[in-house]
Amino acid sequence: MVSKPFQRPFSLATRLTFFISLATIAAFFAFAWIMIHSVKVHFAEQDINDLKEISATLERVLNHPDETQARRLMTLEDIVSGYSNVLISLADSHGKTVYHSPGAPDIREFARDAIPDKDARGGEVFLLSGPTMMMPGHGHGHMEHSNWRMISLPVGPLVDGKPIYTLYIALSIDFHLHYINDLMNKLIMTASVISILIVFIVLLAVHKGHAPIRSVSRQIQNITSKDLDVRLDPQTVPIELEQLVLSFNHMIERIEDVFTRQSNFSADIAHEIRTPITNLITQTEIALSQSRSQKELEDVLYSNLEELTRMAKMVSDMLFLAQADNNQLIPEKKMLNLADEVGKVFDFFEALAEDRGVELQFVGDECQVAGDPLMLRRALSNLLSNALRYTPPGEAIVVRCQTVDHLVQVIVENPGTPIAPEHLPRLFDRFYRVDPSRQRKGEGSGIGLAIVKSIVVAHKGTVAVTSNARGTRFVIVLPERG
């Protein structure tokens, strides 16, 4: 299968320039079209008014009932001679031409090719192409006339109820057409120049408008791993970029948090591994410094075994979290009775709880949930181990289970010193300890609660913690059917 070559999208500057220029040029051409159309309509109305004025004058002469035809035609010729750029033709009731403008073709010969004038508003007005002849122009001397606007109307005394003549009047429109063509050419030239100017102006405006984007880009490029505390000021950018800057600040804040946790994680894991390794080396060096009895060597080996077991557990926990980070932690779900699972965990911690004088209590129904039994037991074990570490002797750790709206809640409560609110959001971070020294003996590796969160998330649930003067409360919420 042949993949299509990657085609980079057009730049924002190109697209903005294209659309703004297109819209502006289109608006200019629309204005030009409206102007040309308005001029055409204006000239058409002006010509029609002239034609009506001429026809009214000639109609008065030809309608005179007491005049002979010869007298009418003589008067007609006197009147027509006073009009320039006008052709007249007069036909009798038999369709025979009885008069037409002297020195000009009979316009009736061209009338059959006349077309209706679309620019004329009202009245039967036609356009003629021809005849062609030289006639006086408007301030231009003589010019060639070949385009006419024509009307025809019945005139003269009535015979059998009908006028005896049909009058044809044609007015030259070449001067108007020349004016319109000249105007169109000028508008086209002007539009071409303006279009080029618009493109350059828009390009310049877009370039200037993108200056804040380039400024933000430069600021972002200057941020390195050593400057993750730097934030962009949203007040210094246009409002269109404010959300982008805020989103970037949120992103860099998350990166800073991850980077800090990663740095702390590297330091913590190095410290956690260094301590048992140092103990192993020290104890081995002491054992080898002189001859030892078998009992002394066994004690050293047992001590080393404890350190190695602790390291193995920590490595196992880290591999578990790595699987969770890469979405490889897939629970093998089956329906479980949480009361039974809590009972198994209680059995495991019962001896330790008795040694510390702490009572373990379970309150609630036999909640059913779809989950991985080993994972859920591990999460409960980590919570109980954490609770035993901080519960004073003579107190009780209570595990509650309840089902609300198809959600199963597992609550682990223990009395003890409350945790400061600023620590609560980070309790589930790896190697995070409330004690700033982070080195309390017997506190564990510091990743137990991180494992709890990974297991709960793998089961599509949530885990939260609250703490006050009455104690600390962890709440796990799991979907009943997974």
From Swiss-Prot:
It comes from the Bacteria. Residues 37-186 are periplasmic. One of its GO terms (molecular function) is ATP binding. It is a multi-pass membrane protein. It catalyses: ATP + protein L-histidine = ADP + protein N-phospho-L-histidine. It is found in: Cell inner membrane. Keywords: ATP-binding, Cell inner membrane, Cell membrane, Copper, Kinase, Membrane, Nucleotide-binding, Phosphoprotein, Transferase, Transmembrane, Transmembrane helix, Two-component regulatory system. CDD domains: HAMP, HisKA. Residues 207-260 form the HAMP domain. Residues 268-482 form the Histidine kinase domain. One of its GO terms (cellular component) is plasma membrane. Its EC number is 2.7.13.3. The chain crosses the membrane at residues 16-36, 187-207. The modification Phosphohistidine is found at H271. Residues 1-15, 208-482 are cytoplasmic. The keyword Nucleotidyltransferase does not apply. Autophosphorylated. Member of the two-component regulatory system CusS/CusR involved in response to copper and silver. Acts as a copper/silver ion sensor. Activates CusR by phosphorylation. This is Sensor histidine kinase CusS. The gene is cusS.
